[in-house]
């Protein structure tokens, strides 16, 4: 029976290299198409693949051709309509020939539609979250947080059969057999040459010829006795565990669900948090997410209740900040955790509560968090909460504010808040 072992890196997908090259070449156009498509999706359909369209003119490539003008004589095979000196009418262009779907109808003209292709979920998320990172992330060197990763570390002479390296073992076998038989093969070659000379010489030298044949047979037997493979030749893939200090982080998601937040505003907040959740879960292994919903009272909830609960009420933002402070003190030591927070609200708050929010953030939360982002989702003018937070932004470098007016602002605001910085802080 014959066995075929496919060791090609892209054996099951032969065009993967070409596909990756295409994605790298037209990354700017693909990312632009993704940023336009993200806002057209449903709230729960953010992590599937995507059909990407690129204008045809963007993927055109340079080509060599003859210059315009001059006199040229050509013979076109299959021509049965024209003879020399006939004038060929130029095709008429029309509004329907652009191919982009944006022009007016026309009875003539032609063009090309935009180039459309499908990208996978992984490719979509890689492009969606490219160049994004949690700001000010620090490596917490704690014994209980140190993980170990297995890495290749060359080859070893001992190991289990599952880790045997066939190629390296055969290379060693060939080297050993070559070294052990090289001298004998040279001697065998010399004896065979002498035997050929004696066999063709006159008069015949039967005794010498018999002696040479006997020595040749002995040398061949010695060469054949060298084993093809020996335990000395076997090599096994070696693996070692290396310490990999982990950066563990916790993200607090605070969402206003008061009566002033209409359904469209809540949907935009949900879209932002779903993007944030996908980004965190895809980028970092050790990230916990704490969901807090608030109206007049704040409550820590699970993921499903955070996104789909219908509970509503008045607005006291400080209740969420107080609850976050309690959770931090109870479960997340700032010396061991990188603490992040993202707050989404329409900016409507009880007037006397906004100064209290300023005080809680300035004295309790901002000194212990790595990064705090506030997203205000409204088409109205900013109110007291925004103005109080503006004072914090001018004082604390780890506090950021952004304004979302409609769905088209969600993804640009998300990238602005979590764009990768030039350097990551280290302890």
From Swiss-Prot:
This is UPF0229 protein YeaH. NCBIfam families: PRK05325.1-2, PRK05325.1-3. InterPro entries: UPF0229 (IPR006698). Pfam families: DUF444 (PF04285). Residues 79-110 are annotated as: Disordered. Residues 92-102 have a biased composition (Gly residues). The lineage of its organism: Bacteria, Pseudomonadati, Pseudomonadota, Gammaproteobacteria, Enterobacterales. Belongs to the UPF0229 family. Residues 79-90 have a biased composition (Basic and acidic residues). It comes from Escherichia coli O139:H28 (strain E24377A / ETEC).
